[in-house]
Amino acid sequence: MTNNITSNIASNTIVYLYDGSFEGMLTCVYEGYYSDDKPEGIYNTYTYEADLFATPKYIITDLEKSHKVGLAIVEKLSETFFHKIVNAFFSEDYDVATHIYKLLRYGFKNGPEVIMHVSHPLVSAVVDLANAVGRETHLFVGLVRFMKLKGGIYYCKFGPTYNQVPLLAEHFSHRLSDQTWVIHDVNRNLAVFYDKNEWYVNEFHGLNSYELDDEELLYQSLWKTFHKHIAIEERVNPTLQRSFMPKKYWKHLIEMN
């Protein structure tokens, strides 16, 4: 009798798996909304932990379906709603896709104003992650340090808590649109490459060797000297420094090396 009950629970509970991409996640949202499956959760197939009481179903990424969902979010909910979802997604939280799916179902049913109901568990599950990612993005927009390499390519390495590469790519493709640059996340072996026309993200394990441009060597020397001279010993406040710039980020800063 117990085995039959367990079997029924397992067969009736479906979870969707996707390829880890934002488009893959939105495809799952589409399928969950229009199919009869009514999945209990959506998970990245590469990090999914098998559940005895759930039947996984892999959903192939469909760009047309994901585009429809993205468009529906913007048109029926709001751009703010969409940006919250994007930021939350790049937190890489294990349950983030499930949280997003449930919030979207709630939002499409009740309207765009639900994003303001931050005390609601379906809303806070996404908004809290989005805000954490957004704070770190804002920090790195002013914190990343590009080095000019011989050949004119600008290179930056950093180690964020969240997956900031796609978010910073969007910012710097406008800010530094006339330069060729690479932003390298050393924690994830991931980088965004920009060639003055478009950017793309790929796996990247770093440069085997590189030579700094002569002008860059001079700049780094001047910057370190400047930082040393303004840090008057009596006024050095490590606690305050850490509050503005967490120490875990220091090793990638020119002035801290």
Language-model region placement:
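Acidic, Ser/Thr-rich peripheral helices and adjacent loops at domain boundaries
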Residues: 60-65, 199-211
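Charged, alpha-helical interface segments at or near domain boundaries
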Residues: 43-138
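Conserved aromatic-histidine-acidic binding/catalytic patches
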Residues: 14-21, 57, 121, 153-164, ...
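Internal, well-folded beta-alpha domain core
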Residues: 113-203
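N-terminal ordered "arm"
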Residues: 2-61
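Short coil/turn segments at secondary-structure boundaries
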Residues: 83-88, 187, 236-242
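Long, compositionally biased intrinsically disordered terminal regions
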Residues: 180, 191-192, 196, 211-257
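Short, hydrophobic/amphipathic alpha-helical patches that form generic packing surfaces
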Residues: 24-35, 101-109, 170-174, 220-228
